[in-house]
């Protein structure tokens, strides 16, 4: 039997589609359905690594976790990773395919559509329900001829579509009614209901708004979802950072340098969730003044990021910075003595001196390592802590001085190994490694924070599963009757 598809469409980018798909995946799973997320094409430098070493969008991997299944490439067959200068690396079925500009990508849409349908068919064959996510708006009329992620997917599977608007940004009537108006008649017939997301205050105050939307659209408003203050799920892309430091709070301050083509910045979400910790994304050295630590995150363009740091004045500022300095993946490469790209892996290639804060050198190769990994910490604040995360990089880094590894990798994919990774300075102040997800380990994260002078205070009660918390929030707004109607389970 082929699984039916529910599709969450949005009136624009960042209206909450990804989070709502996450919630629906958990709600479906709670009701006994074998459910899987799907997004035909995603644009983000936040990638996750599947068990077989493939890349998919981090947001889709989070949705799979909500569905309580392993993420696979069928859930996100095309991933677009922007590299700057209007070019992007295209990841197809979890493997880097080629780097294209927008026009080249557009010309290959029909070939990519075959990949989309093949993977969606495979996913539907092994599930009870697929919950698909659109991208941006389904009525970008100048782009619609090349659509492989919104209404073309909906038409292909006859999806039951839900259209979501963000009332917090204003213009909810124009968002929802305008989008419906611009859909083709056969597309509009697929839309089964509307959702109003991110309402601040008492939803009862929007009862007139619900009536107006239903009268003018002829569709039910399935729910008015209140603003969710305690959403502890990764943001999808750097748009979230451009909205400001929404995770910041009073207390110990950690600065994250917002590098060009920043990638996998959800590495630092566990830090921001700790009480008494402020996480601040910065672009200027002056913003380091009250920080006790600074983190250099991953980036799709390490050499370009190196030049950017020099131009912004970070070289001098980081050498004078008295606190802890950390690099993850590309950030680790930046902390070293030299970065070389003889094959032009990152574009034009070249050779740059690093920041000179760790005695390591990096050389890029054509082979990309994407793998889940287990490791053991050698850091003085968390000796022996068992870590789990993933590696995703094309550079290879070696120590050129006394070898002081930060971690020992014990498993890469299915292979047992014993390999050192990363480096830590003699005084423990500067360190870096390739392992994404290192801060998700409680012992490592809290040990490092206490090393910086953090005092956790009274131990908080263990929080509920964030997916259950989110699902409960959405179900309360929609109602059980509507949830079961949406899933067609009576």
From Swiss-Prot:
InterPro entries according to UniProt: Class_I_gatase-like, CobQ/CobB/MinD/ParA_Nub-bd_dom, CobQ_GATase1, CobQ_N, CobQ_synth, GATase_3, P-loop_NTPase
Residue ranges of every copy of the GATase cobBQ-type domain listed in the record: 251-444
PROSITE patterns reported in the protein's UniProt record: GATASE_COBBQ
Keyword hit for Plastid: no
Pathway stated in the Swiss-Prot or TrEMBL entry: Cofactor biosynthesis; adenosylcobalamin biosynthesis
Keywords: Cobalamin biosynthesis, Glutamine amidotransferase
Active site: residue positions: 329, 436
Protein family membership: Belongs to the CobB/CobQ family. CobQ subfamily.
NCBIfam families in the cross-refs: cobQ, PRK00784.1
Function (record text): Catalyzes amidations at positions B, D, E, and G on adenosylcobyrinic A,C-diamide. NH(2) groups are provided by glutamine, and one molecule of ATP is hydrogenolyzed for each amidation.
Protein name: Cobyric acid synthase
Gene name in the database record: cobQ
């Amino acid at each position: 039997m082929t699984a039916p598809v529910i599709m969450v469409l949005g009136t624009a980018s960042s209206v909450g589609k990804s989070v709502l798909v996450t919630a629906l995946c958990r709600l479906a799973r709670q009701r006994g359905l074998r459910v899987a997320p799907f997004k035909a094409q995603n644009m983000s430098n936040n990638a996750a690594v599947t068990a077989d070493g493939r890349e998919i969008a981090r947001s889709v991997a989070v949705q799979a976790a909500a569905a309580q299944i392993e993420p696979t490439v069928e859930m996100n067959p095309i991933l677009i990773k922007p590299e700057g200068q209007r070019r992007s690396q295209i990841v197809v079925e979890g493997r880097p395919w080629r780097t294209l500009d927008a026009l080249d990508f557009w010309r290959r849409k029909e070939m990519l559509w075959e990949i989309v349908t093949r993977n969606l068919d495979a996913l539907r064959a092994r599930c009870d329900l697929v919950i698909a996510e659109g991208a941006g708006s389904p009525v970008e009329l100048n782009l619609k001829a090349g659509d492989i992620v919104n209404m073309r997917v909906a038409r292909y599977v006859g999806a039951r579509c839900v259209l979501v608007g963000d009332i917090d940004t204003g213009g909810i009537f124009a968002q929802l009614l305008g989008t419906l108006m611009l859909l083709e008649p056969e597309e509009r017939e697929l839309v089964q209901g509307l959702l109003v997301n991110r309402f601040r205050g008492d939803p009862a105050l929007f009862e007139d708004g619900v009536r107006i939307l239903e009268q003018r659209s002829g569709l039910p408003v399935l729910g008015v979802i209140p603003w969710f203050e305690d959403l502890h799920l990764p943001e999808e892309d750097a748009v979230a950072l451009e909205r400001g430091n929404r995770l910041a709070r009073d207390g110990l301050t950690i600065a994250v340098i917002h590098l060009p083509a920043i990638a996998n910045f959800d590495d630092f979400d566990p830090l921001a969730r700790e009480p008494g910790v402020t996480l601040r994304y910065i672009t200027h050295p002056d913003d380091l003044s009250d920080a006790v630590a600074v983190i250099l995150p991953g980036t799709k363009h390490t050499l370009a990021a190196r030049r950017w740091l020099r131009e912004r004045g970070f070289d001098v500022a980081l050498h004078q910075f008295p606190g802890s300095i950390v690099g993850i993946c590309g950030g680790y490469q930046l902390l070293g003595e030299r970065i070389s790209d003889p094959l032009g892996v990152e574009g034009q290639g070249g050779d740059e001196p690093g920041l000179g804060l760790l005695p390591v050198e990096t050389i890029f190769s054509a082979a990309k390592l994407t793998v889940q990994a287990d490791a053991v910490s050698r850091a003085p604040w968390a000796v022996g802590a068992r870590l789990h995360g993933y590696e995703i990089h094309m550079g290879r880094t070696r120590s050129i001085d006394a070898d002081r590894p930060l971690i020992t990798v014990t498993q890469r994919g299915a292979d047992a190994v014993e390999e050192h990774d990363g480096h830590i300075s003699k005084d423990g102040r500067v360190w870096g490694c390739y392992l994404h997800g290192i801060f998700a380990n409680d012992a490592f994260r809290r040990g490092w924070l206490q090393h910086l002078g953090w005092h956790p205070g009274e131990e908080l009660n263990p929080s509920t599963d964030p997916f259950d918390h989110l699902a409960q929030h959405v179900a309360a707004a929609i109602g059980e009757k509507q949830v079961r109607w949406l899933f067609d389970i009576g």
